[in-house]
Amino acid sequence: MELSEHFTFGVPGAKFMPSYRGGFWDGKIRLFDTKTNLIYFGLRFELARFAESRGYKFSLFDNSIDITKDDVNDFIKHLKVPLEVRDYQLDAVYHAIKHSRALLVSPTASGKSLMIYCLIRYCTLKQQKTGKKTLLLVPTIQLVSQMFKDFQVYGFDAESNCHMITSGKDKDADKPIYISTWQSVYKMKRDYFAQFNAVFVDEAHLAKAKSLSTIMEKLTDCPYRFGLTGTLDGKETNRLTLSGLFDVPKNVTTTKKLMDSGTIAKLKVNCLVLNHSKEDKKIARIIKTYQEECDYLVLNKSRNLFISKLATTLKGNTLVLFQYVEKHGVPLTEQIRGMTDKEVMYVSGITKSDEREDIREFAEKSDDVIIVASNGTFSTGINIR
């Protein structure tokens, strides 16, 4: 009971969840299973601290392998990647290989896909004698295509070696690497996941979602586990869950370091505060619900006109994100198109994955395109160099 209580936490926002309100769940997450007496391997150091603080005797299993950073560097050079592998990327790949599992925290534009590629090539090399496969999970169908094409850029024959899985696609193929949205495979039975001995989760902070945790728990015979994310939200429950599923977080680099080194452009945020008309303010005062407030904002003609003018006058590629498709995204796109000769591209959930990838590639080759996209399609992991 003492161990169970130590690894039991209240879930933030649980009181708003239907299962809690209905009395089916107490709003807590338990990382130690009292039925099986098992706990996530990634929590071994947390468990050791628990035992040490109470004077309990324990032995800690060392899962690291005998390999040097020079060995890893030689392996990466052998891959002949046509891009520079930076020092922090080498450090991250070495750390992951050394421990056979890792949770790498690295910001946007730090080259996470290159780190994933190097690690996948290492895993496939180790799998040649076993016939096992590698599973790469990403949160969106667009990232499935983007990761596939990134591998091609790195000089890999992705067509022969990678199987892309999205909703409605075949879940099996005679290829060593599967790239899938986690939504496409989470309902598969445990037997399906037995074919993998390496799993990668991009945007791993989403692993706090129950369906993705379920996938990880089905991978019972999977020694290689790697999660990559640009952020951890600071909540103890999420940090421990991610640590358990993968390993103790390793900070690879920071956005500031990337800016200081010139790897990415300096970031400047301009926050624009709009002063609404007296008539609009009167309307706003009688709004009672959050949904009414959202409707007021997205349907406000003056506000939409300001957004459209701003988008058409900015220099360089411009991204306009929206939440509501029919009420906001569609009319906003039409208004912007009517005000400019620039290329205006629209992306929403119904846009096919190959079309989204074509738009992303077009934007990479352009310097004056406007993309109007739903928040769900362009909010996570999209990389336009």
What are these regions (language model features)?
Residues 12-67:
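Interdomain "pre-motor" coupling segment immediately N-terminal to P-loop NTPase/helicase cores
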Residues 31, 50-53, 59-105:
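Conserved pre-motif I regulatory segment
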Residues 104, 136, 320:
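Hydrophobic anchor at the beta1->P-loop junction of P-loop NTPases
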Residues 113-118, 122-124, 128-153, 324-326:
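Conserved Walker A/P-loop ATP-binding site and its immediately adjacent core
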Residues 145, 161-173, 319, 330-331, ...:
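Conserved helicase ATPase core of P-loop NTP-dependent helicases/translocases
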Residues 167-198, 209-214, 377:
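Conserved helix/coil segment N-terminal to the catalytic DExD/H
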Residues 205-270:
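Post-DEXD/H (motif II) to motif III coupling segment of the RecA-like Helicase ATP-binding lobe
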Residues 285-323, 327-338:
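Conserved interdomain hinge at the start of the Helicase C-terminal
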